[in-house]
Amino acid sequence: MNNPKITAFLPCRKGSQRVPKKNIKPFAGFEFGLIQIKLKQLIEACNVDKIVLSTNDDEILNYAASLQNDKIIPHKRVELLSSSETSTDDLVAHALDLIPQGHILWTHVTSPFVNAQLYDKIIQQYRTALLDDYDSLMTTNLIHGFLWDENGPINYD
């Protein structure tokens, strides 16, 4: 199990409420924007074997098809799973329906700074962690702010 196959799951919903067509509108010199950037990064990542693109956006599906890349497995997501009200639990179940076995890398088009080299590094760290009986890896950010709730300070005295 040193090098298990890695399938990237890329959910990409049409209908952003704040920025219309945000996933495919021109951005940073890329004609097809965030989806173009993310698919390029995942295709270039040596440790990503397949990319399951789940979207309800025909324009994104057409763009992905135009790439003619065997790594990409496009999936037309049903509208029931494409609303802003769709729960994370429902989306996780959907991912497992599409990728019933193997190892999943979950990523988003709205993370354009995670490039191919970083994906490869993360996957290599994951594969190393598997040898120590870990079964998952999650990236996080250290918060250097002062957090409060209704009872007062949370992360300091």
Enumerate the predicted regions with their spans.
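A short, N-terminal amphipathic alpha-helix
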Residues: G33-I51, N62
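N-terminal nucleotide-binding beta1-loop-alpha1 segment
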Residues: M1-K21
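Conserved core of the sugar-phosphate nucleotidyltransferase
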Residues: D90-L91, H108-D157
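Glycine-rich phosphate-binding loop signature in dinucleotide/nucleotide-binding domains
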Residues: N3, D97-G102, A129-D132
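Short phosphate-binding loop-to-helix
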Residues: D58-L105, Q117-K121
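Short glycine-enriched, charge-decorated loop/helix-capping segments at active-site entrances
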Residues: K22-A28, V78-L81
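Residues at the starts of beta-strands that form the adenosine-phosphate
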Residues: K5, D49-I51, H103, D135
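Conserved SAM-binding loop
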Residues: P26, L53, W106
